[in-house]
Amino acid sequence: QGQQCGMLWGAALAVGREAYNRSNDVAEAQVMAILATEELTRSFEDHTRTIQCREITGVRMNNLFGLLKFMVESMIAGFDNHRCFILAENWTPDAVKIGQEFAQETTKGEAPAYNCASEMARRLGATEREAVMVAGFAGGLGLRGKGCGALAVAIWMIALQWIRSHPGEHPPMFRYPAVSKLLSAFRKKTGGALACEKICGKKFHSPGQHAEFISQGGCNDILTAIKQNIDYKSGLN
């Protein structure tokens, strides 16, 4: 859908995993993951001015023409010279530094750890480790108000379930019926909106503010709708 860059998803999951490994306190680890992802997103925007895939690549990858255009451009320029790979090379040192710095900090007492992403993961049967890993998706990726964190978690869980059910196999590229079905139901629920800021009608400025919103029932209808419409049986193919 082009809402977010996959590099940021990967980085958010990585700092979430590191937070879980570093802290014996799940609440502290979740806050650490959210704050680290917020900083990762700021750093990423310093390099690109946007976190949206379609704005970085200049193509819409949810259709065949967009995919072909991206692949042809990559082959002509050479993958080492493509904007995405150049971005990865330039941004990775900053991302690693941010991850290392946050891993050494303590966030005890920083704020309540309750968040939409971890709550969605738990409702879908995730382990505590997985729930912490995805915490950075909260509030539209590090509280930035972008693509819905709960939806991101559900898509990740679909992929995770497929991998576990197909050990040693490579997932299909670009065509995911279960994800398409979920996206369709999600858009119907939100009136077409995918961004957290539009769905919630506000932007969160701290983990505590987000936690208060979620604990008071904010987005509960969204989480419920996602769980009702997720289809593991369809998988990715």
Segments predicted by a language model, with ranges:
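Amphipathic alpha-helical interface segments
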Residues: 11-15, 29-124, 154-158, 172-237
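Active-site segments that bind and position negatively charged phosphate/pyrophosphate groups
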Residues: 1-23, 111-169
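Flexible coil/linker segments and helix-coil junctions enriched in charged and small residues
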Residues: 25-27
